[in-house]
């Protein structure tokens, strides 16, 4: 098995065969170990132990680059992955600097820790290229859940709320925006899928940040004006039975009685007027 080198960093082989491993040395001093494990179907997993701290992070990243290149170029793997406990941030950083993208979190059962899943494919752009660098940064950035909802009124000024299959409170029509989808486009799609109607999206009324609540992560709600229609408009709707039990025109009293806490608070702010373009909703009672 080959000795792998990068200037003063040397990987000396310990074990050959199906699961090779190396001793990591820097300027002749042992820094730790790194090994590959065959996971079948063209995939290998990599593990390393070079300590903690900034210097260890850089050492781990350099060792990873050598081993990953060896896995692709010499051993014929098409994917190398690592499963790193989420509290080992130095190792997660080393994986990213070493060219591995953050792909998600693997939950740990019982006393096992949750683990960050890192991965690199043989045809990913080089980590030192512009495309590769952006891809690595993008994979590690947090994402924000986005919800698009619409305020649709009838000729009496009542607002449309949906009775839902998955919670007792009624809510505004709309839903979660898909990755890469514009909020207004997502609202049109959601109403077409769930209510069977195609709407014209008007002005943005506000962006409403919702804090985490009842096991749901925080989210940003884009509330759009859907205008006014005749109350009979609901007769043309075809409801998606897995999510929508029914729809109701609601005055302020009905909203307070049946609406989800976030919807009640938001609609009250809309009715009060002078709504800011961005607002933060108060934390609802659990």
Question: Can you describe what each PLM-predicted range is?
Answer:
Residues 83, 99-117:
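Conserved catalytic-core motifs of GNAT/GCN5-like acyltransferases
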Residues 29-37, 45, 149, 160-161:
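Conserved beta-strand in the GNAT
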Residues 35-37, 42-53, 83, 170-175:
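Conserved acetyl-CoA binding element of GNAT-fold acetyltransferases
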Residues 73-85:
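Conserved GNAT acetyl-CoA-binding A-motif
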Residues 177-200, 208-261:
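Unchanged
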Residues 168-169, 240-286:
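Nudix hydrolase/Nudix homology domain
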Residues 119-149:
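Acidic, metal-coordinating catalytic segment for phosphate/diphosphate chemistry
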Residues 57-71, 93, 97, 183-188:
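Conserved acetyl-CoA-binding loop-helix of GNAT-fold acetyltransferases
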């Amino acid at each position: 098995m080959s000795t792998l080198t990068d200037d003063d960093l040397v990987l000396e082989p310990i074990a050959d065969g199906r699961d090779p491993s190396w001793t990591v040395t820097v300027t002749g001093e042992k820094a730790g170990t790194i090994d590959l494990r065959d996971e079948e179907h063209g995939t290998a997993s990599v593990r390393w132990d070079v300590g903690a701290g900034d210097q260890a992070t850089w050492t781990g990243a350099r060792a990873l680059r050598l081993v990953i290149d060896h896995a692709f170029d010499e051993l014929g793997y098409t994917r190398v992955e690592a499963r790193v406990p989420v509290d080992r941030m130095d190792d997660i950083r080393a994986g990213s600097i070493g060219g591995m993208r953050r792909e998600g979190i693997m939950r740990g059962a019982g006393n096992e820790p949750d683990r960050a899943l890192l991965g690199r494919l043989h045809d990913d752009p080089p980590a030192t290229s512009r495309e590769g660098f952006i891809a690595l940064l993008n994979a590690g950035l947090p994402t924000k859940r986005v919800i698009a909802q619409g305020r649709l009124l009838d000729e009496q000024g009542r607002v449309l709320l949906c009775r839902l299959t998955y919670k007792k409170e009624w809510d505004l029509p709309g839903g979660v925006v898909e990755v890469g989808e514009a909020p207004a486009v997502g609202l049109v799609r959601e109403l077409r899928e769930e209510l069977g109607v195609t709407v014209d999206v008007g002005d943005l009324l506000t962006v409403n940040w919702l804090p985490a609540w009842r096991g749901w992560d925080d989210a940003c709600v884009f509330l759009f004006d859907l205008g006014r229609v005749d109350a009979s408009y609901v007769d043309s709707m075809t409801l998606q039975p897995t999510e929508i039990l029914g729809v109701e025109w609601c005055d302020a009293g009905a909203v307070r009685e049946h609406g989800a806490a976030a919807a009640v608070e938001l609609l009250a702010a809309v009715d009060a007027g002078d709504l800011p373009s961005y607002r933060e909703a108060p934390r609802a009672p659990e």
